[in-house]
């Protein structure tokens, strides 16, 4: 039973598809920057979903063009919400990228599991405990490969 | 194997969500508060762009929160990336077209940016859109001449006072015995530039704040990138 | 006077915007701005709390009556948590002065403002905005410690919280597409007809997982041990003590007002049980103080979710009592961990070095486990009686898990207490024994004093909590407060 391919279905499928692709990307990626990009995709999907929540076929943008009788207008509230959500997304992404720059300078990698391992090692070293085996990669006590001597950037190692 | 499971899971999730969202009445939303706002907004806020009256009137506190989020992100990025910037000697200067074009475009972009901000209550556009154009205008010279520096102290001054004036306009309403962030000075001249009372002022604050915030974020990222 | 409520959000934001500029002009002046604003906020809220008629009221922001505009809803519960946000912000104020202090203090002001907003706001999307503000300010403050591990923990938290906000927005889109409104009171009116279906359930699940990230809900709490181990103790105390409770409060409000499906409560109950099991067992295995506290906090939040799942808000009193109790205890314990961080084995002999801290630790542990007559006992007792009164097997399973978790909790807390009271090993010099002292010990002492005061005044405090819970439970009161004249006809 395949439903008819209406514009309605296409738009909803796009919104939900983008959200799903983004979320799947976050879960499946091993590179931290790709995870952030996947989040951007997912956010685009939900923003489309929000706009759709107030959309009408027979209506114009909610701006008065003349006094007197008005044509039907789309719901202005979701548009305002999307504006807010987009700006919030931009702020979070910029912050994410700046943290990623620092991590890359310190750990010389952006691989998700390697960063997690090094973080666990760092936390354990600060606390002075034997390292807990990582929850996500229970492969026993893997010795960490040494950070390559030739760093990607010599200048930004410490701020 | 793990990837396959993940993909199957994601696909199933997508289908489930689609099935659920199919229950929504598309193209004919309930518009419970939407139509009420459409009916009342021109009289209550004096703006012909109803999205503007939602952003700066009905949901002004959301906008304030969103400005705070941008501010928090910029401040956090500042904390993370630090203050000291090594000079960007390694990056090559932009080509002739970029440098000359940047010089020509800068005043034009400033004009357009401010135009969009000031007409936010009349036409599509407003503080966010205009602010982004302003930020781009300031970022362009940075692309053309990587050595150029933005004045971070000036930017943070604009950041601070633009955000503060948004709140102060809101507090002014409170001081007059009205509610916090209530629009003031509404005149009965719908469609004119000076029609929406304090809304254009709020949008000016939003535009300056967004512009300064984004410019400082971008230049910070660019300068750290340059130091690599 | 009620209009001044908006000031408790607006003034911290104003202070945060201006702080970096003012600090450049005069540091000596700038350092007092934040505490002064928060103290004023405490004064406003305390005044409303003491002189008000204890009747809930609603403030329409921008003068636009809800549901068109956004309103702040202040019942005694919301006021209590808003007051707690400002007060804890003052207690955990980042006093440290260095070149970054302006930014750090600005972020702290933003965090407090957002927390206050979370407690007071009566609009779904507005809650989302404040929720994101809390998140971004937290990222900045965690990353501010500047270690590599802190950056890694922040980015992992940021990505998880990004998933959360995507889901939250999705849930909001579903709700708005179905009902056409965002105001919680308005939604409460429309929910029985429009949201008691699969769509409503899906929206609830999206919101639950999305907001659950901050509430340390079971599957989305992997950030908790990492962030609490890398952030400063003061920040961890604020996050574990207050922010998690606020996220929980939002879920509770949504459950009470909008989503009445039995499935919703069951999902919360199951996730709560899983949270208790995973949290307490991980805490038992932990070899480090802060990690132990972080996992134990996951377990405690799981208990709160179990209490929340009781039908028709019967668990309201238990949720309230447990949440406030955990707020005090966890804040105190994290302050002790400030001096006692690191491996548990290093703590041997520290009772002799700082007897007051050891005494406080034992006091907090006893109350957390639920030793009468400490307040923890009464909080847990309320939950046990409510759970035992249920007939459904899932609730009884929750009760069993809860009782077993208490035993595990006692095991790991008293193990630490035993280590503390052991004599120091011979080979260690006295200055190697970690000492808890200074400001953090004083703060922990403050929480300990509060706990003892509550123990002495348990009867009036209990009565007061009962009125608060009854008021928060009353859906009709909520709706009638937001739409005073014409209930039901709010278009």
What are these regions (language model features)?
Chain C
Residues 1-7, 11-98, 102-106, 185-189, ...:
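Transmembrane helix-loop-helix hairpins at membrane boundaries of multipass inner-membrane proteins
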Residues 33-49, 162-170, 361-369, 446-460:
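Hydrophobic alpha-helical membrane-insertion segments
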């Amino acid at each position: 039973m395949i439903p008819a391919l209406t514009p309605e279905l296409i738009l909803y499928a796009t919104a939900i598809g983008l959200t799903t692709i983004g979320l799947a990307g976050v879960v499946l990626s091993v590179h931290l920057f790709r995870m952030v990009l996947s989040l951007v995709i997912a956010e685009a999907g939900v923003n489309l979903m929000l706009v759709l929540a107030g959309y009408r076929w027979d209506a114009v943008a909610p701006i008065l063009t003349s006094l007197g009788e008005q044509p039907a207008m789309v719901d202005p509230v979701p548009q305002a919400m999307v504006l807010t959500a987009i700006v919030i997304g931009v702020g979070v992404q910029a912050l994410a990228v700046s943290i990623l720059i620092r991590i890359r300078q310190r750990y010389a990698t952006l691989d998700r599991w390697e960063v997690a391992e090094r973080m666990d090692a760092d936390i354990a070293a600060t606390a002075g405990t034997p390292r807990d085996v990582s929850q996500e990669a229970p492969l026993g006590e893997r010795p960490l490969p040494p950070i390559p001597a030739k760093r990607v950037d010599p200048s930004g190692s410490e701020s | 194997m793990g990837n396959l499971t993940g993909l199957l899971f994601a696909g199933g999730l997508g289908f489930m969500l689609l099935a659920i969202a199919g229950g929504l009445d598309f193209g004919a939303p309930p518009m419970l508060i939407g139509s009420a706002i459409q009916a009342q907004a021109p009289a209550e806020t004096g703006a012909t762009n109803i999205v503007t009256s939602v952003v700066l009137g009905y949901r002004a506190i959301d906008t304030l929160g969103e400005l705070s989020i941008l501010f928090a992100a910029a401040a956090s990025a500042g904390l993370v990336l630090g203050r000291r910037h090594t000079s960007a000697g390694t990056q090559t200067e932009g080509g002739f077209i970029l440098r000359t074009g940047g010089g020509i475009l800068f005043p034009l972009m400033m004009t357009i940016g401010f135009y969009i901000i000031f007409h936010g209550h009349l036409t599509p556009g407003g503080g966010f859109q205009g602010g982004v154009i302003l930020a781009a205008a300031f970022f362009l010279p940075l692309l053309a001449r990587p050595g150029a520096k933005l004045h971070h102290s000036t930017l943070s001054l604009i950041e601070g006072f633009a955000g503060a004036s948004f709140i102060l306009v809101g507090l002014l309403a409170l001081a007059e015995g009205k509610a916090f962030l209530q629009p003031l000075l509404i005149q009965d001249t719908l469609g004119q530039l000076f029609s929406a009372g304090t809304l254009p002022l709020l949008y000016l604050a939003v535009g300056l704040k967004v512009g300064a915030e984004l410019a400082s974020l971008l230049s910070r990222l660019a300068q750290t990138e340059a130091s690599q | 006077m009620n209009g001044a409520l908006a000031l408790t959000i607006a003034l911290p934001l104003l202070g945060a915007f201006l702080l970096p500029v003012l600090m450049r002009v005069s540091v000596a002046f700038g350092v007092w701005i934040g505490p002064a604003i928060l103290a004023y906020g405490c004064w406003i809220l305390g005044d409303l709390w003491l002189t008000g008629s204890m009747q809930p009221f609603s403030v329409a922001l921008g003068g636009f009556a809800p549901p068109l505009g956004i309103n702040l809803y202040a019942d005694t519960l919301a006021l209590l948590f808003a007051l707690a946000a400002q007060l804890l912000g003052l207690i955990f104020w980042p006093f440290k002065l260095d070149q970054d202090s302006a930014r750090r203090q600005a972020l702290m002001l933003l965090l407090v403002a957002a927390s206050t907003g979370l407690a007071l706001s009566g609009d779904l999307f507005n809650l989302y905005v404040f929720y994101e503000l809390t998140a971004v300010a937290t990222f900045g403050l965690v990353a501010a410690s500047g270690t590599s591990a802190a950056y890694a923990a922040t980015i992992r938290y940021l990505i998880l919280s990004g998933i959360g906000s995507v889901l939250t927005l999705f849930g909001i889109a579903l709700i708005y597409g179905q009902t056409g409104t965002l105001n919680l009171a308005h939604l409460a009116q429309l929910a029985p007809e429009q949201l008691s279906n699969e769509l409503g359930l899906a929206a609830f699940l999206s919101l639950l997982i999305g907001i659950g990230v901050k509430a340390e809900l079971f599957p989305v709490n992997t950030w908790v041990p990492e962030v609490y181990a890398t952030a400063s103790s003061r920040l961890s105390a604020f996050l574990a003590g207050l922010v998690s409770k606020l996220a929980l409060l939002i879920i509770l409000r949504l459950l009470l007002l909008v989503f009445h499906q039995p499935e919703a409560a069951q999902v919360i109950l199951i996730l709560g049980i899983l949270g208790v099991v995973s949290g307490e067992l991980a805490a038992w295995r932990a070899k480090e103080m802060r990690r132990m506290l972080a996992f134990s906090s996951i377990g405690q939040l799981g208990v709160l979710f179990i209490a929340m799942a009781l039908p028709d808000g019967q668990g309201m009193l238990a949720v309230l009592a447990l949440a406030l109790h955990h707020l005090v205890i966890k804040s105190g314990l994290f302050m002790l961990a400030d001096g006692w961080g690191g491996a548990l084995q290093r703590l041997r002999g520290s009772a002799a070095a700082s007897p007051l801290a050891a005494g406080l630790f034992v006091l907090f542990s006893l109350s957390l486990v639920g030793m009468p007559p400490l307040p923890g006992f009464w909080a847990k007792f309320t939950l046990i009686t409510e759970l035992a009164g249920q007939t459904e097997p899932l609730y009884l399973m929750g009760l069993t898990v809860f009782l077993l978790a208490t035993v595990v909790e006692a095991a790991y807390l008293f193990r630490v207490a035993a280590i503390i009271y052991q004599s120091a090993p011979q080979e260690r010099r006295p200055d190697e024994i970690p000492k808890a002292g200074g400001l953090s010990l004083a703060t922990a002492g403050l929480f300990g004093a509060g706990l003892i005061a509550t123990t002495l005044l348990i009867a009036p405090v209990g009565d007061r909590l009962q009125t608060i819970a009854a008021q928060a439970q009353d859906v009709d009161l909520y709706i009638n407060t937001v739409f005073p004249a014409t209930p039901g006809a709010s278009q």
